[in-house]
Amino acid sequence: MDNETGKTFLDMARERWSVRKFTPEQISDVHMARILEAGRMAPSACNYQPQRVLVLQSDEAIARMRSVTHWAFNAPTVLLVCADLAESWKNVDGCDSAEVDAAIALDHMMMEAWECGVGSTWVRGFDERVMRQAFGIPATWKIVAMMPMGYPAESARPSIWHFKRKSNEEIYRFI
């Protein structure tokens, strides 16, 4: 189905790239609401919705984030996406869906951000213990990733790795 820009999801997936340079402008309330709604509407196992997201926007929160990892870049907003292991579906062999569910929510927010003209990148480059302590993350939450985001700087460009894609034959196996 086409969105208001007339682009399909596949168009956006092909266009989107990891933005690592941002303007200092804070994300508008309208865009932020749309991005967060996309995460809320993401599918999850048995609709348990274990995703928990810290929205870091205050100067103090961003400074704290930058003190524990340099991978926040100069983003004016960082989402710290977690999975509540106490509120997630587990299958009969104990496999917990929480991290996958939170990752799906993160991806939904990332794609909606792109639709809004907001760039982002998926980051797992941090010490979880330090991050947990810095932001008072509950013991039942697993930190899945952080998503620095903001409006792309004029000088922002995709990395050289963005254009390297495996072939269908390397990825898919029809049985």
Kindly give the residue locations of the regions a language model identified:
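Acidic, surface-exposed loops and disordered segments
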Residues: 1-175
